[in-house]
Amino acid sequence: MEIINACLKNVGVEENMIEKVIETFQKENDECYNLVHIFNKAAIVFHRNGQHKKSLEMYEKAFGNIFNGEFALSDLFYSVNGMASMYQALGDYDIAIKKYNSVIKIIKDMCLDNNSDLVYALMGIASISQIKGNYDEALSKYNEALEINEKLYGRNHIETAFVLNRLGMLYHELDDNDKSIDHFNESLKIYREKYPNKLFNIAFTISRLAQSLLKMGNDSEALEKYQESIDIFNKIFTISHQAVAFSLYGIGTVYEFRSEYSKALEKYQESLQTYKNVYERSEKYQHYDIASCLYKIGLVYKLSGNDNESTTYLNQANQMFESTSTNINDKNYQACKKFLQD
């Protein structure tokens, strides 16, 4: 493990993070010690720790060392897809799409059998297209990824379940709640029956299912699902995580739906603080998720008759939406602007 220690210390990685990288190699019985692979592994560790900028830096170092020695082609794709995913996490969507497309082009031009790397890139583009409101493009890419995974693994596989999950999220945004719920339930069934130890996947799917259930007016079931997801997440995470923030926000929407505004306000504020804790680790102080919480807090104050507090939060939200939203038709963004104009 000396080569890992020396390599990472040489680029300024702190001792505690080097230890985590070494632990990852040991847990996975990984004996590939070329520079590209080491930096890719370090990037994964920083990503898991919520440090997106440091993760991006490690992926860039991995890519920069591609032609300095021996490397596996999979490490090339991993580093480029990794850079793309970090740019995506940091909100630099155009750069992310270029990176994802470069992976797709190489794989297709060379007729390579790197289906997992191809699917990862397709999913990345689909996700960004969804964020931008390009729903037809998102649906096309998700279905392409689903077709590849079904051919590779069959329907009842974790990789297929992941794509079904994303399709559920897309159909939710398209207000096709029946399809959304069907996809979430199918995904959840696969996870629970085939992969019961995949707690994050289970909890994540439950939280998204709750969102669609509330849209159908099933507030009691939605509240139950959101709380179930938080209970599972709390078994996994010891630090603030955006998945927990999402479920807290979801509980806020249930109480808002019920006109229980004091409870809604409490949950939206909890969600806001959790999101802030998450994104500040990557020095990201403005984010769409934070803006959405600010908007919801402003909305609840307005519904409660507190116009002064409402205006303060709505103005903060609007400013952040303007600097972070890539979809001008986003529902929260448009609603926030309308309240301020009225």
Swiss-Prot record:
It holds the Pfam family TPR_12. SUPFAM superfamilies: TPR-like (SSF48452). Keywords: Repeat, TPR repeat. TPR repeats lie at residues 36-69, 77-110, 119-152, 161-194, 203-236, 245-278, 291-324. Coiled coil: none annotated. This is Putative TPR repeat-containing protein R856.
